[in-house]
Amino acid sequence: MGYSRRRRRWRKPSKGSWGNRIIATFILALLAWAFIPGLGPDLAGLSTKGAPKLTLPDWGKSADQILSESVQTDLVKAVAALPEGKWESASPYQRSQFGIRWADVDRNGCDTRNDILKRDLSQVHTKPGTRDCVVVFGEFTEPYTGRYQQFRKGAQTSSKVQIDHVVALSNAWKTGASRWDAKAREQFANDPLNLLAVDGSSNQDKQDSDAASWLPSNKGFHCQYVALQTAVKQKWQLWVTKEEKRAMAAVAASCPAQPLPAG
């Protein structure tokens, strides 16, 4: 039994229908621009709903301006009290000027590197026969990246976790330490207040940078990092450059709950 299929006739859209579509598309685009955050003025305030707004100081201001307009916490006051000066360059920095690496300055039988590993890591395992001194394994949430990380002692693995001088030795040399005697410099290089177990690649990225040129990629650690630098500079009576102080002030001003570490 045969049948026939009726073909629909295609109708060319009228000029009016094309015009209506163009107008509708334009209106939708205009609404998106007006109300979606990042596209336009965000008239609905969607970008600020559900999250507190963080207001950072104006980086165009001086350190003194930033600090004077901030909540007067211990950290803010300590940054404000740091003396300003220029880098000293009478003689170049050398690591040997700060004594042997990781000396046992506290005479507890363990070198400073292993002392810091034991302090900063958890689930620590030590090598038998070393009086619980030589750390062979540990784990921690690494502060500079915020990631979980393990330490395993070995020729190819030990360097993945390094001990950082929060205030770099060369920075200290240029801001006052060049005037110290050898014993004071060795004490500074092994001061636990200025030492952190950190990700090796982050430490290499930092090198001898100050706060004006380097901060950890983990923004959640910025407050504690600057607080540590401030406490170290204060304890050892080191000065800061103008740029360094402004960077430290900008961070400190945004950290009303950050205490100043005890030395």
Question: Where do the PLM segments sit?
Answer:
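Domain-level detector of nuclease and nuclease-like folds
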Residues: 144-263
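Hydrophobic membrane-insertion alpha-helices, especially the h-region
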Residues: 21-38
